[in-house]
Amino acid sequence: MNKISQTEYNNIVALYNSGLSAQKIGDVYSVYASTIRKILNKCNVQMRDDSHKYRKYTLNENYFDVIDDQNKAYILGLLYADGCNYTKTNMIKLELQERDRDILEKINSKLDSNRVLEYIDLHSKNENWQSTYRLTIVNKHMSQTLNDIGMVPRKSLILEFPTCLEKNLYSHFIRGYIDGDGCIYNGKQKFITCATTKQFCESIINILQDELNIHTYYRDIPVKQDSPTKLLYIGGISKIKTFLDYIYEDAELYIQRKYDTYKSFCHEILYK
Protein backbone atom coordinates (compact mmCIF):
# COMPACT_ATOMS: atom_id res chain seq x y z
CA MET A 1 0.00 0.00 0.00
CA ASN A 2 2.13 2.87 -1.30
CA LYS A 3 -0.19 5.76 -0.56
CA ILE A 4 -2.90 5.54 2.06
CA SER A 5 -6.01 7.62 1.46
CA GLN A 6 -7.95 9.38 4.20
CA THR A 7 -10.77 6.89 3.69
CA GLU A 8 -8.37 3.99 4.30
CA TYR A 9 -7.03 5.73 7.41
CA ASN A 10 -10.61 6.06 8.70
CA ASN A 11 -11.38 2.43 7.88
CA ILE A 12 -8.26 1.19 9.65
CA VAL A 13 -9.19 3.18 12.76
CA ALA A 14 -12.77 1.88 12.60
CA LEU A 15 -11.60 -1.71 12.21
CA TYR A 16 -9.29 -1.37 15.20
CA ASN A 17 -11.97 0.27 17.34
CA SER A 18 -14.38 -2.51 16.39
CA GLY A 19 -12.06 -5.05 18.01
CA LEU A 20 -9.75 -6.30 15.24
CA SER A 21 -6.09 -6.56 16.12
CA ALA A 22 -3.35 -4.69 14.28
CA GLN A 23 -2.17 -8.07 12.98
CA LYS A 24 -5.55 -8.92 11.43
CA ILE A 25 -5.94 -5.45 9.93
CA GLY A 26 -2.46 -5.79 8.48
CA ASP A 27 -3.55 -9.05 6.85
CA VAL A 28 -6.48 -7.24 5.22
CA TYR A 29 -4.25 -4.52 3.76
CA SER A 30 -1.24 -6.80 3.13
CA VAL A 31 1.08 -4.81 5.40
CA TYR A 32 2.92 -5.52 8.65
CA ALA A 33 1.13 -5.06 11.96
CA SER A 34 3.79 -2.49 12.84
CA THR A 35 2.64 -0.37 9.88
CA ILE A 36 -0.92 -0.48 11.17
CA ARG A 37 0.25 0.53 14.65
CA LYS A 38 2.10 3.52 13.18
CA ILE A 39 -1.08 4.60 11.39
CA LEU A 40 -3.11 4.22 14.58
CA ASN A 41 -0.56 6.24 16.54
CA LYS A 42 -0.60 8.93 13.86
CA CYS A 43 -4.39 9.09 14.23
CA ASN A 44 -4.02 9.40 18.03
CA VAL A 45 -5.84 6.13 18.66
CA GLN A 46 -5.42 4.78 22.17
CA MET A 47 -3.87 1.34 21.84
CA ARG A 48 -5.32 -1.63 23.70
CA ASP A 49 -3.33 -3.92 25.92
CA ASP A 50 -2.70 -7.46 24.67
CA SER A 51 -5.50 -8.96 26.73
CA HIS A 52 -8.07 -7.23 24.53
CA LYS A 53 -7.41 -9.57 21.62
CA TYR A 54 -8.88 -12.44 23.62
CA ARG A 55 -12.23 -10.70 24.02
CA LYS A 56 -15.07 -12.54 22.29
CA TYR A 57 -17.60 -10.51 20.33
CA THR A 58 -21.04 -11.91 19.70
CA LEU A 59 -23.19 -11.43 16.61
CA ASN A 60 -26.06 -13.17 14.88
CA GLU A 61 -24.38 -13.16 11.48
CA ASN A 62 -27.47 -14.70 9.87
CA TYR A 63 -29.75 -11.84 10.95
CA PHE A 64 -30.32 -10.52 7.42
CA ASP A 65 -30.42 -13.89 5.66
CA VAL A 66 -34.22 -13.68 5.53
CA ILE A 67 -35.99 -10.35 6.04
CA ASP A 68 -39.12 -11.68 7.69
CA ASP A 69 -40.10 -9.21 10.41
CA GLN A 70 -40.57 -5.48 10.83
CA ASN A 71 -37.39 -4.92 12.84
CA LYS A 72 -35.18 -6.49 10.18
CA ALA A 73 -36.92 -4.39 7.53
CA TYR A 74 -36.51 -1.20 9.57
CA ILE A 75 -32.81 -1.80 10.27
CA LEU A 76 -32.23 -2.61 6.60
CA GLY A 77 -33.91 0.68 5.65
CA LEU A 78 -31.76 2.65 8.08
CA LEU A 79 -28.64 0.92 6.77
CA TYR A 80 -29.68 1.74 3.20
CA ALA A 81 -29.93 5.39 4.19
CA ASP A 82 -27.05 5.96 6.61
CA GLY A 83 -24.98 2.78 6.62
CA CYS A 84 -21.82 1.80 4.75
CA ASN A 85 -20.85 -1.69 3.66
CA TYR A 86 -17.14 -2.12 2.89
CA THR A 87 -17.09 -5.57 1.31
CA LYS A 88 -13.30 -5.51 0.89
CA THR A 89 -12.86 -5.49 4.67
CA ASN A 90 -16.23 -7.10 5.55
CA MET A 91 -17.05 -4.02 7.62
CA ILE A 92 -20.52 -2.54 8.13
CA LYS A 93 -20.83 0.90 9.72
CA LEU A 94 -23.86 2.83 10.92
CA GLU A 95 -23.22 6.32 12.29
CA LEU A 96 -25.93 8.57 13.74
CA GLN A 97 -26.13 11.83 15.64
CA GLU A 98 -25.25 11.72 19.33
CA ARG A 99 -28.88 12.34 20.30
CA ASP A 100 -29.93 9.19 18.41
CA ARG A 101 -27.69 6.84 20.38
CA ASP A 102 -30.71 4.98 21.76
CA ILE A 103 -31.70 3.50 18.38
CA LEU A 104 -28.12 2.29 17.80
CA GLU A 105 -28.21 0.51 21.16
CA LYS A 106 -31.48 -1.17 20.20
CA ILE A 107 -30.11 -2.24 16.82
CA ASN A 108 -26.99 -3.61 18.48
CA SER A 109 -29.24 -5.67 20.74
CA LYS A 110 -31.37 -6.95 17.84
CA LEU A 111 -28.19 -8.17 16.14
CA ASP A 112 -27.23 -10.06 19.32
CA SER A 113 -24.06 -7.98 19.25
CA ASN A 114 -22.00 -6.87 22.22
CA ARG A 115 -19.96 -4.36 20.25
CA VAL A 116 -19.31 -1.08 22.03
CA LEU A 117 -20.57 2.05 20.27
CA GLU A 118 -17.79 4.41 19.28
CA TYR A 119 -18.19 8.08 20.20
CA ILE A 120 -17.00 10.48 17.49
CA ASP A 121 -16.32 13.89 19.04
CA LEU A 122 -16.89 16.33 16.18
CA HIS A 123 -18.39 19.22 18.15
CA SER A 124 -15.10 20.02 19.90
CA LYS A 125 -13.47 20.46 16.48
CA ASN A 126 -16.21 22.72 15.13
CA GLU A 127 -19.12 24.08 17.15
CA ASN A 128 -21.35 23.81 14.08
CA TRP A 129 -20.78 20.05 13.84
CA GLN A 130 -22.73 17.47 15.78
CA SER A 131 -20.92 14.62 17.48
CA THR A 132 -21.97 11.10 16.56
CA TYR A 133 -22.04 7.50 17.69
CA ARG A 134 -20.94 4.70 15.38
CA LEU A 135 -21.76 1.01 15.38
CA THR A 136 -19.18 -1.06 13.51
CA ILE A 137 -19.70 -4.72 12.66
CA VAL A 138 -16.97 -6.81 11.03
CA ASN A 139 -18.36 -10.05 9.62
CA LYS A 140 -17.85 -11.55 6.18
CA HIS A 141 -21.17 -13.38 6.00
CA MET A 142 -23.28 -10.39 7.04
CA SER A 143 -21.39 -8.01 4.77
CA GLN A 144 -21.85 -10.32 1.78
CA THR A 145 -25.52 -10.89 2.60
CA LEU A 146 -26.20 -7.15 2.69
CA ASN A 147 -24.26 -6.71 -0.54
CA ASP A 148 -26.40 -9.38 -2.21
CA ILE A 149 -29.58 -7.67 -0.98
CA GLY A 150 -28.47 -4.38 -2.49
CA MET A 151 -26.51 -2.52 0.17
CA VAL A 152 -23.43 -2.21 -2.00
CA PRO A 153 -20.33 0.00 -1.69
CA ARG A 154 -20.84 3.55 -3.02
CA LYS A 155 -24.58 2.87 -3.05
CA SER A 156 -25.66 6.52 -3.06
CA LEU A 157 -25.44 6.73 -6.86
CA ILE A 158 -27.06 3.39 -7.74
CA LEU A 159 -29.40 2.53 -4.88
CA GLU A 160 -32.52 0.53 -5.75
CA PHE A 161 -35.46 -0.59 -3.61
CA PRO A 162 -34.76 -4.13 -2.31
CA THR A 163 -36.64 -6.95 -3.99
CA CYS A 164 -36.38 -9.26 -0.97
CA LEU A 165 -39.21 -7.57 0.96
CA GLU A 166 -42.79 -8.74 1.25
CA LYS A 167 -45.41 -6.00 0.87
CA ASN A 168 -46.31 -6.10 4.56
CA LEU A 169 -42.75 -4.97 5.37
CA TYR A 170 -42.57 -2.04 2.94
CA SER A 171 -43.75 0.49 5.53
CA HIS A 172 -41.14 -0.56 8.08
CA PHE A 173 -38.31 -0.43 5.55
CA ILE A 174 -39.45 3.02 4.40
CA ARG A 175 -39.63 4.20 8.03
CA GLY A 176 -36.01 3.13 8.48
CA TYR A 177 -34.99 4.97 5.34
CA ILE A 178 -36.87 8.13 6.35
CA ASP A 179 -35.24 7.97 9.80
CA GLY A 180 -31.89 8.00 8.04
CA ASP A 181 -32.24 10.28 5.03
CA GLY A 182 -35.67 11.85 5.36
CA CYS A 183 -36.86 15.14 6.86
CA ILE A 184 -40.29 15.82 8.34
CA TYR A 185 -41.06 19.54 8.34
CA ASN A 186 -43.79 20.59 10.75
CA GLY A 187 -43.53 24.37 10.69
CA LYS A 188 -45.72 26.86 8.84
CA GLN A 189 -45.04 24.75 5.79
CA LYS A 190 -45.56 21.03 6.25
CA PHE A 191 -43.92 18.50 3.97
CA ILE A 192 -41.64 15.46 3.89
CA THR A 193 -38.52 15.16 1.77
CA CYS A 194 -36.08 12.35 1.15
CA ALA A 195 -32.91 12.43 -0.95
CA THR A 196 -32.15 9.28 -2.91
CA THR A 197 -31.69 7.92 -6.43
CA LYS A 198 -34.21 8.28 -9.23
CA GLN A 199 -34.85 4.51 -9.24
CA PHE A 200 -35.46 4.46 -5.49
CA CYS A 201 -37.80 7.48 -5.72
CA GLU A 202 -39.83 5.81 -8.44
CA SER A 203 -40.20 2.63 -6.39
CA ILE A 204 -41.50 4.53 -3.35
CA ILE A 205 -43.84 6.60 -5.52
CA ASN A 206 -45.32 3.41 -6.98
CA ILE A 207 -45.69 1.82 -3.52
CA LEU A 208 -47.46 4.87 -2.10
CA GLN A 209 -49.79 4.98 -5.07
CA ASP A 210 -50.62 1.27 -4.88
CA GLU A 211 -50.84 0.98 -1.09
CA LEU A 212 -52.24 4.37 -0.07
CA ASN A 213 -53.52 6.01 -3.26
CA ILE A 214 -51.08 8.85 -2.61
CA HIS A 215 -49.76 10.62 -5.68
CA THR A 216 -46.41 12.30 -5.15
CA TYR A 217 -43.31 13.16 -7.15
CA TYR A 218 -39.57 13.75 -7.12
CA ARG A 219 -37.51 16.62 -8.44
CA ASP A 220 -33.91 17.67 -9.00
CA ILE A 221 -32.01 18.91 -5.98
CA PRO A 222 -31.54 22.70 -6.30
CA VAL A 223 -28.12 23.70 -7.75
CA LYS A 224 -27.45 20.03 -8.55
CA GLN A 225 -29.48 19.61 -11.72
CA ASP A 226 -27.27 16.88 -13.19
CA SER A 227 -26.94 14.90 -9.97
CA PRO A 228 -28.23 11.28 -9.94
CA THR A 229 -29.66 12.06 -6.49
CA LYS A 230 -33.26 13.27 -6.53
CA LEU A 231 -35.55 14.74 -3.88
CA LEU A 232 -38.73 12.82 -3.10
CA TYR A 233 -41.44 15.24 -1.96
CA ILE A 234 -44.68 14.58 -0.07
CA GLY A 235 -46.84 17.64 0.55
CA GLY A 236 -50.36 18.36 1.71
CA ILE A 237 -51.66 17.70 5.22
CA SER A 238 -53.87 14.79 4.21
CA LYS A 239 -51.10 13.03 2.28
CA ILE A 240 -48.55 13.60 5.04
CA LYS A 241 -50.91 12.24 7.70
CA THR A 242 -51.73 9.16 5.62
CA PHE A 243 -48.06 8.50 4.91
CA LEU A 244 -46.91 8.92 8.52
CA ASP A 245 -49.75 6.76 9.84
CA TYR A 246 -48.66 4.11 7.34
CA ILE A 247 -44.98 4.00 8.33
CA TYR A 248 -45.59 4.27 12.09
CA GLU A 249 -48.47 1.80 12.43
CA ASP A 250 -47.47 -0.90 14.99
CA ALA A 251 -43.86 0.33 14.78
CA GLU A 252 -41.39 -1.10 17.29
CA LEU A 253 -38.19 0.65 16.20
CA TYR A 254 -37.89 4.33 15.28
CA ILE A 255 -35.83 7.42 16.02
CA GLN A 256 -37.64 9.04 18.91
CA ARG A 257 -37.31 12.68 17.79
CA LYS A 258 -38.87 11.93 14.40
CA TYR A 259 -41.66 9.96 16.03
CA ASP A 260 -42.26 12.94 18.33
CA THR A 261 -42.56 15.18 15.26
CA TYR A 262 -45.18 12.78 13.88
CA LYS A 263 -47.18 12.88 17.12
CA SER A 264 -46.90 16.68 17.25
CA PHE A 265 -48.16 16.88 13.67
CA CYS A 266 -51.15 14.68 14.52
CA HIS A 267 -51.94 16.78 17.59
CA GLU A 268 -51.81 20.02 15.61
CA ILE A 269 -54.19 18.92 12.88
CA LEU A 270 -56.54 17.34 15.44
CA TYR A 271 -56.96 20.56 17.41
CA LYS A 272 -56.57 23.04 14.57
Where are these regions (language model features)?
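Internal intein/HINT superfamily modules and their associated LAGLIDADG
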Residues: M1-K272
